[in-house]
């Protein structure tokens, strides 16, 4: 069936662009002339019959001559009319302000209460121990480095140390901690608890005397009325290490403290078994009882050197504890301070110093946290033997090796000190020719052992 001739739209031919009719929006835009009032921008123009485009003088299509203002256009100098705005209720800003103040007040009150609670727990008693200025860091280096003596007070079952319960216990864990704030490092020195200090009476370089009932360093505080300052002065005199603050930890409270943390993840380098307690090698979550066994054990397989091997094992606990604290963050740790300092820890540090230490600690990379121990000559038996007592088994400090260790790692702010300048008793007691190793390690190395155990699947931690 034939069709009529198709009409060709010549406007679309020869690649000529199609003429588009202005939409309402574009038409409205065209009539928004300068100087006209705003209300015209909201007024819909009346429908208009489309007009053919006018020819410009040059014969081209388009031009500005065809634009006409709306029928109701106002004079150019007509007054501008503003939109009416909804009035904000008078009470609304006041309510918002009060709400914000209430929130801020609540936060401030909570923070102040927490700080006051911590400060109350940290306030020393009237007769609290204080360290003499002579053993502290030189004034010119204060703020760059802080040196802290950390001692674990152990209460061995069945032994009555004194009639005053607050003075019971030996300092079986002695840890010298140097916070190098300026250098971004933490260096820790373990001193074996049975290190010989001299006879039962210790005479310091300045003429002061202190007692040591068992000849060993762990009895100094107890032998002098539980005064931790006495131990600090002995360490300063014999090792020439400045001490600014002390921290004592109740080792019997370790169980509760670890349980309050929800356990501590620790890498155990070898199987442990003694007196019915067993821990298997691997990355384990230790509860309080297991942690106590881990840090106190010094017998059984892997403990040929008894106390020295125990010091090496305790490093893995420190590494696990450090990792846990760093993962908690400063805010969560501060929230734990009232419980910790009220029940487990005593110190002469104020809250500002503790907060500064926490912030500094969280910024220290594990590769800059170092552990070492003082080299000693092993096996000096029967010290103080009597007809009814076999005596004590002690170790003799190796002054030469200790001087080298301390000059390498711990005397950045004091300068080197020779073995002769220290007041150690190396030459006062018989000993062998070979001493133990300083066993310098960094926590980053210990963390890697934990990571390797996790990667190999040797862990009881779900998702580790």
Describe each region flagged by the PLM.
Residues 2-43, 52-100, 104-464:
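Non-catalytic, solvent-exposed segments at the cell envelope interface
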Residues 49:
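Glycine- and charge-rich intrinsically disordered segments
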């Amino acid at each position: 069936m034939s069709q009529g001739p198709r009409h060709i739209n010549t406007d679309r031919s020869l690649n000529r662009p199609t003429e588009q009719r202005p939409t309402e929006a574009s038409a409205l835009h065209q009539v928004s002339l300068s100087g006209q009032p705003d209300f015209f921008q909201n007024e819909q123009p009346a429908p208009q019959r489309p007009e053919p485009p006018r020819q410009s003088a040059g014969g081209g299509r388009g031009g500005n001559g065809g634009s006409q203002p709306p029928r109701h256009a106002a004079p150019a100098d007509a007054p501008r009319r503003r939109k009416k705005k909804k009035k904000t209720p008078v009470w609304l800003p006041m309510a918002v302000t009060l709400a914000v103040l209430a929130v801020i007040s609540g936060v401030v009150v909570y923070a102040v209460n927490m700080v006051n609670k911590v400060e109350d727990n940290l306030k020393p008693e009237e007769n609290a121990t204080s360290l003499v200025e002579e053993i502290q860091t030189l004034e010119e280096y204060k703020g760059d480095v802080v040196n802290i003596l950390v001692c674990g007070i152990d209460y061995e079952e069945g032994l009555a140390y004194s009639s005053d319960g607050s003075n019971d216990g030996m300092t079986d864990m002695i840890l010298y901690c140097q916070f190098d704030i300026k250098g971004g490092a933490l260096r820790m020195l373990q001193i074996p608890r049975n290190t010989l200090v001299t006879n039962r009476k210790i005479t310091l370089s300045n003429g002061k005397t202190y007692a040591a009932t068992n000849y060993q360093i762990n009895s100094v505080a107890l032998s002098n009325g539980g005064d931790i300052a006495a131990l600090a002065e002995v360490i300063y005199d014999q090792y020439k290490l400045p001490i600014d603050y002390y921290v004592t930890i109740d080792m019997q409270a370790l169980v509760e403290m670890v349980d309050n943390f929800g356990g501590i993840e620790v890498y155990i380098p070898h199987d442990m078994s003694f007196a019915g307690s067993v821990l298997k090698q691997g990355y384990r979550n230790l509860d309080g009882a297991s942690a106590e066994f881990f840090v106190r054990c010094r017998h059984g397989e892997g403990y040929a050197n008894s106390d020295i091997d125990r010091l090496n094992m305790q490093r893995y606990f420190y590494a696990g504890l450090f990792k846990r604290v760093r993962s908690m963050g400063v805010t969560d740790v501060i929230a734990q301070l009232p419980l910790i300092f009220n029940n487990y820890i005593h110190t002469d540090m104020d809250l500002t110093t503790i907060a500064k230490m926490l912030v500094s600690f969280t910024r220290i990379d594990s590769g800059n946290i170092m552990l070492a121990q003082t080299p000693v000559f092993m096996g000096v038996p029967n010290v103080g033997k009597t007809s009814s007592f076999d005596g004590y088994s002690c170790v003799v400090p190796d002054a030469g090796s200790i001087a080298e260790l301390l000059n390498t790692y711990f005397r950045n702010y004091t300068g080197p000190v020779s073995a002769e300048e220290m007041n150690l008793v190396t030459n006062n007691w018989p000993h062998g020719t070979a001493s133990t190793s300083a066993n310098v390690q960094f926590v980053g190395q210990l963390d890697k052992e934990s990571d390797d155990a996790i990667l190999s699947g040797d862990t009881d931690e779900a998702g580790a």
